[in-house]
């Protein structure tokens, strides 16, 4: 929701493509655009993964929840649960906030659940592209474990 830095957006797209997601959705306004830098940093991810700009992120999240049964999980410092406590095996949208500011209020209100990534050191949060990778690959891990029959949501 409003990632401004093109290097961060490119890294998010790279992780998303590697995790097998269907699309990356960004706000049409107040967000980095797909530029030559984004394409380069994504290491090919931007060439294989649709990056869709929407005019109203909150409305988009509401629509995919209602029309397609997508669970919307947002990352936030103040959260309902930690990442590893959340079932991420079904249809899922992971929402990450802008650098420094986090998610906008209406975007936050359209999340089914807010999650945080547990931090063991002295820093209190990760860079948005690192947070994206951690969340995406936790979902991949859960789905693989479910396929193997060793994970029960």
Predicted regions: what is each one?
Residues 1-153:
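Post-transcriptional modification and biogenesis factors for structured RNAs
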């Amino acid at each position: 929701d409003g990632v401004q830095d093109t290097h961060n957006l490119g890294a998010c797209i790279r992780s998303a493509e590697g995790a097998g997601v269907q699309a990356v959705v960004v706000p049409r306004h107040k967000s980095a655009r797909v530029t030559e830098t984004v394409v380069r940093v994504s290491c090919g991810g931007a060439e294989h993964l649709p990056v869709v700009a929407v005019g109203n992120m909150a409305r988009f999240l509401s629509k995919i929840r209602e029309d397609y049964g997508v669970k919307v999980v947002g990352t936030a410092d103040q959260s309902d649960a930690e990442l590893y406590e959340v079932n991420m095996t079904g249809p899922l949208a992971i929402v990450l906030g802008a650098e420094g500011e986090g998610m906008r209020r209406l975007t936050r209100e359209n999340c089914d659940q807010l999650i945080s990534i547990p931090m063991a050191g002295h820093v209190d949060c990760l860079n948005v592209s690192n947070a994206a990778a951690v969340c995406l690959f936790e979902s991949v891990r859960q789905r693989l474990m479910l396929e193997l029959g060793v994970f029960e949501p």
